[in-house]
Amino acid sequence: MRNINIGSIYRHFKGKEYKVIDIVNDCESVGDDIKKVVIYQAMYGNNEKWARKYEDFASLVDSEKYPEVSQKYRFEEYEHNL
């Protein structure tokens, strides 16, 4: 699975930017199958905070649903940070 970096800015494939605040455990997961959740904050508007399953945050863009999108991943680290 892709590495998501706390403190980095990521660009969503639809163009908005978000800062990863933390990666936490999902309270609904149990035992050896603890799921991770990414907490991230919008870098626009009211800077709202959001939570998304780690695997969804790190997932590929659905190229069948969004054939016009050139970005490979749903969220990609903004190169300005690198």
Regions found by a protein language model. Give the residues of each.
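Mixed-charge, low-complexity intrinsically disordered regions
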Residues: 1-82
